[in-house]
Amino acid sequence: MPGTPGSLEMGLLTFRDVAIEFSPEEWQCLDTAQQNLYRNVMLENYRNLAFLGIALSKPDLITYLEQGKEPWNMKQHEMVDEPTGICPHFPQDFWPEQSMEDSFQKVLLRKYEKCGHENLQLRKGCKSVDECKVHKEGYNKLNQCLTTAQSKVFQCGKYLKVFYKFLNSNRHTIRHTGKKCFKCKKCVKSFCIRLHKTQHKCVYITEKSCKCKECEKTFHWSSTLTNHKEIHTEDKPYKCEECGKAFKQLSTLTTHKIICAKEKIYKCEECGKAFLWSSTLTRHKRIHTGEKPYKCEECGKAFSHSSTLAKHKRIHTGEKPYKCEECGKAFSRSSTLAKHKRIHTGEKPYKCKECGKAFSNSSTLANHKITHTEEKPYKCKECDKAFKRLSTLTKHKIIHAGEKLYKCEECGKAFNRSSNLTIHKFIHTGEKPYKCEECGKAFNWSSSLTKHKRFHTREKPFKCKECGKAFIWSSTLTRHKRIHTGEKPYKCEECGKAFRQSSTLTKHKIIHTGEKPYKFEECGKAFRQSLTLNKHKIIHSREKPYKCKECGKAFKQFSTLTTHKIIHAGKKLYKCEECGKAFNHSSSLSTHKIIHTGEKSYKCEECGKAFLWSSTLRRHKRIHTGEKPYKCEECGKAFSHSSALAKHKRIHTGEKPYKCKECGKAFSNSSTLANHKITHTEEKPYKCKECDKTFKRLSTLTKHKIIHAGEKLYKCEECGKAFNRSSNLTIHKFIHTGEKPYKCEECGKAFNWSSSLTKHKRIHTREKPFKCKECGKAFIWSSTLTRHKRIHTGEKPYKCEECGKAFSRSSTLTKHKTIHTGEKPYKCKECGKAFKHSSALAKHKIIHAGEKLYKCEECGKAFNQSSNLTTHKIIHTKEKPSKSEECDKAFIWSSTLTEHKRIHTREKTYKCEECGKAFSQPSHLTTHKRMHTGEKPYKCEECGKAFSQSSTLTTHKIIHTGEKPYKCEECGKAFRKSSTLTEHKIIHTGEKPYKCEECGKAFSQSSTLTRHTRMHTGEKPYKCEECGKAFNRSSKLTTHKIIHTGEKPYKCEECGKAFISSSTLNGHKRIHTREKPYKCEECGKAFSQSSTLTRHKRLHTGEKPYKCGECGKAFKESSALTKHKIIHTGEKPYKCEKCGKAFNQSSILTNHKKIHTITPVIPLLWEAEAGGSRGQEMETILANTVKPLLY
């Protein structure tokens, strides 16, 4: 056993016997890991000797190593000035002179008291060995050893130093002489000692005889191989009995035992932490005091260790003595060169036990291991943030200090860290030494290359425990975790806004400062970021050095060329496992995958809405804050995003840099070009899980999903209306503000959006780029083409949940829903009238404004809306592009054709809930409903009369103006309405396309056919609420209602007679003018009304269209049929209020009422019989009144 008296008799073991020596040149050849290993071994050896009581006192070399100093970092003059106990050249050879006997006694008192040796039983509390009952023989043997050790002392003549061995003394003497007898044959280097020469030879030995079977790595020495093998093995045979900890080597266990056994007598008063050595305590205290005694003379920066200062000085000197033979790159440290060499060899000897991942450096493995643990022992006193590493805490503290010591000499920009300055310098030099073998992309740093390689390998070692998402980098995982925790450690001092990343805070601060440090000398334009400056430089530079060999196209950037090459290769390396779709880039695949997962990790705290990307969430938040930091210098308009400002500027410049290869059309935005390209392809990769509908774009699918969700997050503060999208809310707000910033230079019309202006301009240019492949019809917009295609396919994707009705447009569904809800959110500020749609309100406002901006160049007529002008122009052009396949009838509008088709199909999809009546058009149903509600929203400002339809009001206004703009070219007759002119023209053509299936009669108008059909069916849908009488026409009901009200608004200017309807007044006027425009072709007789001519014609034809269903009798007029039917029913609907007698005809009732109005009959008879003049008078009255009733 070591430490027994027997072992001491064999001779004193000294620290010199177990010390390893290196010359300054050899020390510099060691890398950091080897230097650290040397320190650990030296300290371990000393502790073992001290534990056994053999080390008399601490050597100066151990003191240096404990303080973290390098053996060769002290200057020559500093060493000479030391006390005489130290040799300035080779301090490791010496032991300071002291009382060796006294030292041994101290060892005995301190160590053997705890040892429990049977021969050295010391009583506790004894001050010296003599006071204790010690076995005399054992103590004498110790004294003999002491004497033996003292006899082996050799002294240096120059520095009066003491040696315990002649070998050490002889070696020390050779060093003073400076004689170097051992010369290297490979180089000019020579050495004092043969051992140093042998060690030096290892540099030139190419063969490495010791090979590791695990990883095939080779080594010069078997001892190095043995140490290396421990990396691969998990075996730890040496276990500590005190704490249970296991070790691979016995020496490590021995060192560990000292830690367990040795009392930590050096305690820190600040935090209570205890240490084995006073030197360790001294270093530790600097954490609390912040003491940095080692100062750099160049820049004034101070350090806590001299070794750190020595490394720092190389930044100023630029010294890089260690050069890589592979690539020629030089380094300031051998350890950095050793790490660098692994880039070329690909060696990764350090493996993680947790996940099996291998690393090229032990430090990288140590950093990696932290990812598996959640412990964060290093806490910041400023903000309480905790860190896993001390180095990260140190870097973090710079944020609070705001100190920027490292300044760029080129542009003057300062940085917190030297590494950031080094990275920054590459901007000026453009150096990128690390190149990817896969794609040829170059990088400034090897670490950047390593990160880049993961894109090709798809390796994602860092996984989130919360959601399972994996990342390429630990830093990305750290940032991702903040999504779950909600942590925002970086706070803006200006506005208090907090951020998850320091980089985002830095960018945010620029909003407050407005600083643009990166300026381009060519045009003087300044930028906030260096990246933006680099991109801008390409605009000025015409150079395109990267050329495609396939097509000859040149590019400014190599990455763009790489992306371009994929077009020729057709290669899509990144495939989706869900749907099989392939992509050119991994980023595109990642974006695509979210479609399948539907994951939305980023949630808005204000409204709860979730987003796929953090950037989208940031943009969304500006809706709540209203922040718009980007302002246009031309018009002053502000935007929330720089990209939106860039797009906006193109309105002023007219720039359209993005061109379509298919059709040559140019666009101002790349996104618009991308959307345009879809018009050339039929692919629809995005499918809705709810209704199986497919879409060309992900954004359209996202918008579509809102229909199913019914969610309306965006609410208007003015009127409370909610919307599915923020864009819809923005559009809605213009109703309240009335703002229209985009004006048409052609006609002066203003619009809310630039896109609306662009659409409007096509009216002037008549451009129609979107063509239907089915029928060849062209459209201004792709959306119009999409809707048009549904005519051919019959597709109706938008279904009403209330009644099940389907629609081809979402807007039509939205309008339809208001039938069920009755909601009218759009209110006119002028008159208080409410509307279901914003478009209806916009049209309504024109009534108050009275403004007519759109003027016809042909006839000078002006209109409120451009659509009305467009409709009007067709009168002059007579163009009717929409033709019916059934009857060949042509129409101006496709919508009119659609309505017309329902005549042939008899489709009536719109049903009235009150009476069950169905209509082919929703507008007809809306008009019909007003019969039940009595609503008359359209009021005449002249006479105050109200109407249920705007068209009726328009027609009514002509009464006051007398205007008749629509003139017949055949006969010169003018009309107030275009529809009346159309009806009139049929008189000249004789065309009757509408035929009755019951009797075969044909009509020139569909409305006439509808009225005629009611003769056969007997349908009378229009009922009077006053008396219950029903009518087959709404006009008859309107006329009838006037009986109850007594109102006669239409007055004849000639005789003052008033009439219920305008048509009756027109008929009456012909009495004064004697005009008879309707002439019979058979006999030449003329009539003042067309209806009278129709009835007259039946005299020639003998036609009796009105047939009785009971007896088959036919009549020329409907009124005659109505009277006849009463014979069969026996119905007597007309009752006398005076006597209660009922009649089957209203005319008989009218005659009957006269009985009650005349003088009583009997007294009149008496007076008539009496004779005389009075009797003759009474006789006349009876003859004229009573007798016709009696006979």
Curated annotation (Swiss-Prot):
UniProt-listed Pfam families: KRAB (PF01352), zf-C2H2 (PF00096)
Zinc finger (C2H2-type) in chain: 154-176, 179-200, 208-232, 238-260, 266-288, 294-316, 322-344, 350-372, 378-400, 406-428, 434-456, 462-484, 490-512, 518-540, 546-568, 574-596, 602-624, 630-652, 658-680, 686-708, 714-736, 742-764, 770-792, 798-820, 826-848, 854-876, 885-904, 910-932, 938-960, 966-988, 994-1016, 1022-1044, 1050-1072, 1078-1100, 1106-1128, 1134-1156
Organism name: Homo sapiens (Human)
General remark: ZNF91 is only present in primates and emerged in the last common ancestor of humans and Old-World monkeys. It underwent structural changes between 8-12 Million years ago, probably to improve the protein's ability to bind and repress SINE-VNTR-Alu (SVA) retrotransposons elements.
Principal cellular location given in the protein's record: nucleus
Alphabetized GO MF terms: DNA binding; DNA-binding transcription factor activity; DNA-binding transcription repressor activity, RNA polymerase II-specific; zinc ion binding
GO cellular component: nucleus
Function: Transcription factor specifically required to repress SINE-VNTR-Alu (SVA) retrotransposons: recognizes and binds SVA sequences and represses their expression by recruiting a repressive complex containing TRIM28/KAP1. May also bind the promoter of the FCGR2B gene, leading to repress its expression; however, additional evidence is required to confirm this result in vivo.
Keyword DNA-binding: yes
Similarity-based family: Belongs to the krueppel C2H2-type zinc-finger protein family.
Record bears the keyword Oxidoreductase: no
Domain KRAB: 13-84
Name used for this protein in its record: Zinc finger protein 91
Localization of this protein: Nucleus
Biological process annotations from GO: regulation of transcription by RNA polymerase II; transposable element silencing
UniProt xrefs under SUPFAM superfamilies: beta-beta-alpha zinc fingers, KRAB domain (Kruppel-associated box)
UniProt keywords, alphabetically: DNA-binding, Metal-binding, Nucleus, Repeat, Repressor, Transcription, Transcription regulation, Zinc, Zinc-finger
InterPro entries tied to this protein: KRAB, KRAB_dom_sf, Znf_C2H2_sf, Znf_C2H2_type
SMART domains reported in the protein's UniProt record: KRAB, ZnF_C2H2
